[in-house]
Amino acid sequence: MIYKVLYQKDKIQNPRRETTQTLYLEAPSAVEARALVEKNTPYNIEFIQELSGNFLEYEEKSANFKLTTF
């Protein structure tokens, strides 16, 4: 599955919508996606969304869509 991960760059500052960033990740489950991001980055994860069907098609059309690999 492909997951959209919304995050803040660090865990020190309070989350603000204006500074939320996104990465896309392929993982077997949302739990494993979270574990991968937590293991490989200092990011503060806000939300993980599974993408499929029309949602995935829409995101793939975005210029920012790029699968992250660790």
Swiss-Prot record:
Its EC number is 2.7.7.6. Pfam families: RpoY. RNAP is composed of a core of 2 alpha, a beta and a beta' subunit. The core is associated with a delta subunit, and at least one of epsilon or omega. When a sigma factor is associated with the core the holoenzyme is formed, which can initiate transcription. It comes from Lacticaseibacillus paracasei (strain ATCC 334 / BCRC 17002 / CCUG 31169 / CIP 107868 / KCTC 3260 / NRRL B-441). Signal peptide: none annotated. GO terms for molecular function: DNA binding; DNA-directed RNA polymerase activity. It comes from the Bacteria. GO terms for cellular component: DNA-directed RNA polymerase complex. InterPro entries: RpoY (IPR009907). Belongs to the RNA polymerase subunit epsilon family. It catalyses: RNA(n) + a ribonucleoside 5'-triphosphate = RNA(n+1) + diphosphate. Keywords: DNA-directed RNA polymerase, Nucleotidyltransferase, Transcription, Transferase. GO terms for biological process: DNA-templated transcription. A non-essential component of RNA polymerase (RNAP). This is DNA-directed RNA polymerase subunit epsilon.
